[in-house]
């Protein structure tokens, strides 16, 4: 088969599969919760694939493939799918479509920039420059969960939040990157709680 196969890319493949599966299931069942749940799982996978990759002995081709497949998966899971999900479930006015398009452009600019600037994913970093694209899913999901509890004008809130998140993707703000084990455990627990809240509220 084409491609490269190791533990790190298995995680990337699984995340992309789950995100796409949840997205299509949300359309089939007309329930946005499945799309957000799939993208949350993909975000957790994205958090771990680089960590696993740094502990593997890989050829230069495998390293390059890992960088490219991770970037392509990010485009699908955290840029295209969120925009299409929010469009399908309410952001359909012309200015909202423009906002979603802006979000997509900001996301691909960010990923292309870091593909050039940081082509070696084995290199550990202490901070992020700008908001990483997987974090957008956590923000969008949190807004949706709060809407279930408070019941505000969700379309209006996303109209404000989406462009802010998009611009944060290409901003130069520095966000500390936590790498200790307890942080990863906490993020996984929060992801599980978030998915449960999506379906319970």
Language model segments and positions:
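Lipid-exposed faces of alpha-helical membrane segments in multi-pass integral membrane proteins
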Residues: 7, 11-17, 38-41, 76-79, ...
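Membrane-water interface of alpha-helical transmembrane segments
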Residues: 2-12, 29, 33, 64-67, ...
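C-terminal ends of transmembrane helices
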Residues: 51-59, 108-123, 167-177
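C-terminal membrane-associated helical module and adjoining short loops/tails
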Residues: 124-201
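Topogenic membrane-insertion module of multi-pass membrane proteins
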Residues: 1-50, 166-201
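Helix-coil boundary and interhelical linker segments in multi-pass alpha-helical membrane proteins
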Residues: 21-37, 76, 80-101, 142-157, ...
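Multi-pass membrane catalytic core of lipid/isoprenoid biosynthesis enzymes
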Residues: 9-13, 55-111
